[in-house]
Amino acid sequence: MPRLSFLLLGAFCMTTFVTPAIANTDTRAALESVAHLDNYQVVELRRYDIAPGQRDRFVRYFDAYFPEAFEQLDCMVFGQFEDRAAPTKFVWLRGYHDINARPIADAAFYYGPVWREHRVKVNALFPGASDNVLLLHPLAPQTGIPVLPAVDPVDEPHGARGVVVAQIFAVKKGDEDAFAQRAQAAFAHYEGVKVHPTGVLVTLDVPNNFPQLPVRTDGPFLVWLGVVENDAALKDFEASASQVEHALAGTGMLRGAPERLVLDPTPRSRLRWWPAAEAKSSP
C-alpha cells in the first residue's frame, strides 16, 4: 500500500500544549526536561484484551514496571489507558526513533530482566492473543505524539487526568493521499473546541521486523488523537467528533465506519491533560 504523503499536512495547525511566550518558569523547565525525548517516527497503537475483572491489576503492574524499562532502551511509552467502552480493554502507545530501532529495543526488553521477572503474572492477566496492533508513523513531522513530562506525584497527587480520544479511519487502498487532504480540512473544525490535538498517524507500510509481536496487515488506517480536560469537555467535543466522522464517512474513501476510542489515562500515563497545558495557544 502506498504511504500517505508527509507533505499533505504541511499547513496542519496542531494546538500546542504550551508555547515559550506564555510558559512560566516551571513549565519551561518541565518541557526542557523532556526535550531529549523526541523524534519517535514509529508508533504502535496496541490494544489488549484483559481477563474479566483483572484490568485494574494489569494497570498496576504496567504502571509500576514498564514505562521506565522501555525508556531505558531508547523507546517511549507515550501513554497507557483504559477503554471506557470495554472493561476488559487496555490500550497503549509505544514509540521508536525509527523502524530499525524497533527489533533492537523489543528484543532487549522481552528477553531482558524486567519482563522475564514479571511475564508469568502479567501474561496470566491477558490470556488471549495481543495482536490488535497498528504500526504507524506521523503523517507529517508536526503531527507526531508529544512526549509530556512524567506524572509528578507531588503536583499531581491524584495521577493523570483528562480523557484521550482516538479516531480511527480505515482508508481504502489507493485513496490514502486524497483522504488525508479531506481529513485535514475536517480536523480544522476542532480548533474551536477545548481539545488538545496530540497526533495524526498513518499506517507504516513495512514488514514486521519483530515477528514475535504480530501487527495488523489490514490497513491502511489514519488515526487522530486528542485530549480533553474532563467529561463535560468530552461531551462538547463528541458533537464535533460525530460531525467530522460523518463528513469523512461520506467521502466514499473508507472501508468501514470510523471507530472512536474514549480512553481514561492510567495514573502514570504521560499522555494526559497536563496542568500546564491549560495556558495553551495556537501557533
Where are each of the predicted segments found?
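Short acidic/glycine-enriched loop/turn segments that link adjacent beta-strands
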Residues: 85-88, 207
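Bacterial N-terminal signal peptides
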Residues: 7-17
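Positively charged n-region of N-terminal signal peptides that target proteins for export
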Residues: 1-4
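An amphipathic, aromatic/His-enriched active-site/gating alpha helix that lines ligand/cofactor pockets
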Residues: 24-38, 60-79, 86, 95-139, ...
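Short, low-order "capping/linker" segments at domain edges
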Residues: 212-214, 270-279
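Compositionally biased P/S/T/G-rich terminal and signal peptide-adjacent segments
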Residues: 26-39, 137-159, 199, 276-281
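Surface-exposed interaction/gating patches
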Residues: 45-52, 57, 140-211, 216-229, ...
